[in-house]
Amino acid sequence: MRTAYLDCFSGVSGDMLLGALLDVGLPEAHLRAVVSALQLDGVTLEISRPVVQGFAATHVQVHVHHHEHDHVHRHLAEIADLLERADLDPAVRARALAVFTRLAEAEAAVHGTTPDRIHFHEVGADDALVDIVGTVAGLAWLGVDRLVCSPLPLTGGWVACAHGEVPLPAPAVCRLLAGVP
């Protein structure tokens, strides 16, 4: 069993995960091939290696070069179709779909509906697809079958999203973290 530990002292994001995977040996060419396999028009990766406060880092940005009237809205079935059409390893496809399914279940619970009726806003956008599928593919390439992370620094306040202003952590995030120490 190969375990990866994420030290999330300042939080975590898809771009941060992709950078960390590159730092521990995921070949850039493999990540770019995964992004290409998704067949998302106008999506590119910008990878840089800055020195931040004296420490080497890997910075990944997903650029979407077409207009997405705010965000693409996709249902779980559309994401499943997109993953099915992509030239991905079947295990990566299944794990990525499991991630999106878990997200749909959390969103459905807080919105009082079913997972198949959830339309993803931010998570259905092209950059989020790259973040999630790229992370799943990177973990698979590295042979990681167990992921552990430090406690997440949860904050308070409000954030604007497709449903208006919601409290932080967002209700679906709270649902995902239920029972996590």
For every predicted segment, state its role.
Residues 6, 92, 112, 118-122, ...:
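General beta-strand structural signal in soluble alpha/beta enzymes
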